[in-house]
């Protein structure tokens, strides 16, 4: 089987567009169409449904996608082993949660790009462990970074490379800030027994699937008394804007509100236990030398508190 057809297949599956796949592969769109038809004829199955919105994998196509990626991984490994003395080069795609993409990775990727000029590094938003699993399995990303307490997915290898501090924050003029009579030490963590006194407050949390927001929401809803009012958003910016306007409280990574705390637009009410930063890779997929190098650099940057960026 011509592996070029498999590469076209996986690229079209990832982009969902004949035009985008052709551009990425530096082929004419008609060539992509011909190659996909040739592969479908060879396998005697339909791999894609051609819809006005683009190319969508059929159930059979989705089932064969991971197998095709394994074949291409084996081809890449063969080429690498034939040129073991070659410099580290290639493309690495990092999947990461929103807060890491916005506040940790930009400077880190800039530093990596300076240190590894022959490696092209891309970032892609990944919202949950299940999404990370799908993207790692399909080859859309090579490595994922998530803020999660744990990830129990058998085909994913996980390691803790750092921790992200969390804080409960509010606007300076919020009634609960003004009601605080005992100043808190910066390192003092919340006593979960105190959550009952928060029940009458309004909270803005990140959408379901965010582990620390989910845990906090469960704790709030489990406390006696009136259930709190909880609104969930898919964006840290939306949460922060509502809190800055004095509409309620939020639990967020400290790094995402550091500038607001420094300028006194927000106040820290309680510190919470840190959430681990997990690095994930697919156990059965080949990890290129470029990806291995990027992973090693990310471990070091996280251990240094990201100051290396």
Go through the PLM ranges and name each one.
Residues 10-28:
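Short helix-boundary/capping micro-motifs
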Residues 89-152:
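Central regulatory/effector-binding core of bacterial HTH transcription factors
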Residues 127-132, 140-141, 147, 209-266:
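Hydrophobic hinge/microswitch elements
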Residues 153-159, 164, 237-286:
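Beta-alpha-beta core module
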């Amino acid at each position: 089987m011509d592996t070029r057809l498999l590469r076209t297949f996986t690229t079209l599956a990832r982009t969902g567009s004949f035009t985008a796949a052709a551009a990425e592969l530096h082929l004419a769109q008609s060539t992509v169409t011909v190659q996909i038809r040739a592969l479908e004829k060879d396998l005697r199955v339909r791999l894609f449904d051609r819809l006005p919105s683009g190319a969508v994998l059929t159930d059979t196509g989705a089932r064969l996608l991971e197998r095709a990626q394994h074949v291409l991984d084996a081809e890449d490994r063969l080429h690498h082993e034939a040129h073991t003395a070659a410099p580290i080069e290639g493309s690495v795609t990092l999947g990461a949660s929103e807060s890491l993409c916005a506040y940790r990775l930009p400077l880190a990727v800039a530093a990596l790009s300076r240190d590894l000029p022959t490696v092209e590094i891309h970032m892609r938003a990944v919202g949950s462990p299940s999404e990370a699993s799908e993207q790692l399995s399909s080859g859309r990303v090579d490595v994922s970074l998530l803020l999660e307490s744990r990830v129990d997915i058998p085909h994913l290898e996980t390691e803790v490379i750092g921790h992200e501090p969390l804080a409960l924050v509010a606007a300076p003029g919020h009634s609960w800030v003004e009601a605080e009579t005992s100043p808190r030490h910066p390192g003092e963590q919340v006593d979960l027994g105190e959550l009952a006194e928060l029940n009458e407050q309004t909270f803005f949390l990140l959408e379901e699937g965010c582990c620390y927001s989910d845990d906090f929401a469960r704790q709030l809803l489990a406390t006696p008394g009136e259930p709190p009012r909880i609104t969930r958003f898919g964006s840290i910016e939306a949460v922060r804007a509502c809190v800055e306007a004095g509409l309620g409280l939020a639990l967020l990574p400290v790094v995402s509100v550091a500038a607001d705390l420094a300028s006194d637009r927000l106040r820290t009410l309680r510190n919470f236990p840190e959430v681990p930063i997990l690095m994930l890779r697919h156990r059965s997929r080949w990890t290129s030398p470029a990806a291995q190098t990027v992973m090693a650099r990310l471990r070091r940057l996280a251990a240094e508190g990201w100051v290396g960026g």
